[in-house]
């Protein structure tokens, strides 16, 4: 093996298979772009993003790790979210939860 080489199995990788998901329509009501990373607790995103927040508690974007979704001012887009795993505790972000989900 060469340093840095990736030896992956053939075929597609199905990320987050079998985990609960929710689809949400999101509108950026602000005057600046908002970018949300793959592992950010969607419930706690920028208040300029308008959507039904209650249904997103405990969810993050269902996209590959290290990537993000950008919402331009005035833009509406539909995103799929996936349930957070692990102990289902959330700390930090905007400080809206700070504990068990």
From Swiss-Prot:
CDD domains associated with the record: Urease_beta
CC annotations in GO: urease complex
Reaction(s) catalysed by this chain's protein: urea + 2 H2O + H(+) = hydrogencarbonate + 2 NH4(+)
Pathway(s) of this molecule: Nitrogen metabolism; urea degradation; CO(2) and NH(3) from urea (urease route): step 1/1
GO MF term set: urease activity
EC number: 3.5.1.5
Pfam families in alphabetical order: Urease_beta
Compartment annotation: Cytoplasm
One GO term of the biological process aspect: urea catabolic process
Keywords of this entry: Cytoplasm, Hydrolase
Subunit structure: Heterotrimer of UreA (gamma), UreB (beta) and UreC (alpha) subunits. Three heterotrimers associate to form the active enzyme.
Family annotation (PANTHER family): UREASE (PTHR33569:SF1)
Protein family per UniProt: Belongs to the urease beta subunit family.
Protein name per the record: Urease subunit beta
Name of the coding gene: ureB
